[in-house]
Amino acid sequence: MDNFFMTWLLPLFIVVGKTLLLLTVLLVLIAYLLYADRKIWAAVQLRRGPNVVGPWGLLQSFADLIKFVVKEPIIPSGANKGVFLLAPFVSATLALSAWAVVPVNEGWEIASINVGLLYILAISSLEVYGVIMGGWASNSKYPFLGALRSAAQMVSYEVSIGFVLVTVILVSGSLDLTTIVQEQNKGLGTYLGLPFSSLLDWNWLILFPMFIIFFISALAETNRPPFDLVEAESELVAGHMVEYSSTPYMLFFLGEYVAIVLMCALTTILFLGGWLPPLDVWWLNWVPGVIWFVLKVCFVFFWFAMVKAFVPRYRYDQLMRLGWKVFLPISLAMVVITAAILKYTSFA
């Protein structure tokens, strides 16, 4: 009995505990990032934004949650009921499951696997199926057009993201996310002999073109403006979510924001040193790594919000052209250049 407890039950309890803790923190973080998103957008437009529910409007996201849950879900008469209801669960579940391998500090992840980057790429590629299912099952032209756009958009930018990840793998020599962060302890700043140079050691500097490509591709991958063509209000009303209401709509919305925060976390891990402090000095090393990680995620999300506020939406043909004719050649060239530098110079 003791052997069964130590071999099976205890590890199971630990995994369940880690999962519940991560989900709780993640959902609370998303609630306040959504609040920040609305506040930033309001500030750019000289409005006040949410300011009624709770002090300074801090409880607005929780009020929205209650509103969505208590509303009546409406299913169109011509919809495929089973697929229609399954689609938002697929979208939200896949978005949440990608977080299983994300380390928010050294050793702080639910599952430590040596191909974590490949796992996240695979899961993020599957998320589009929830959108396609919802668009098709609604039996309406606007959701279906949104689903078709989502599929084409995902294919266009997934290739560029794949090449970006290849360059990071070449530089770090691993698919393990923890190793990728640890390898950023000895980057360009260390190579040049600069003291306290953690900020210059991170991959954003030596892979700057790929950093920009990844950031813009992440906007397209998560359907954020200026690439929100899947749910373009002026063209498709709300895209694949037109016929949804109540909890199913909330699950689509949740999956979208979980994917956005995942891309912010991935940007932090791949290019901004993960949980490493910006300067290698004792008083910054004293700060827990998870705090640095959350601050960097919030910094990346701030730029997601600013792009939404400032940049007008692309036309669909411009979006495709950017993915296939600009990002793909540049990312492919950077893979070749990075491999050549690592092979024929002493930088490796």
UniProtKB/Swiss-Prot annotation:
The chain crosses the membrane at residues 10-30, 82-102, 115-135, 161-181, 199-219, 251-271, 287-307, 322-342. The keyword Ligase does not apply. It catalyses: a quinone + NADH + 5 H(+)(in) = a quinol + NAD(+) + 4 H(+)(out). It is a multi-pass membrane protein. InterPro entries: NADH_UbQ_OxRdtase_su1/FPO, NADH_UbQ_OxRdtase_su1_CS. GO terms for cellular component: plasma membrane. HAMAP family: NDH1_NuoH. This is NADH-quinone oxidoreductase subunit H. It comes from Bartonella bacilliformis (strain ATCC 35685 / KC583 / Herrer 020/F12,63). The lineage of its organism: Bacteria, Pseudomonadati, Pseudomonadota, Alphaproteobacteria, Hyphomicrobiales. The gene is nuoH.
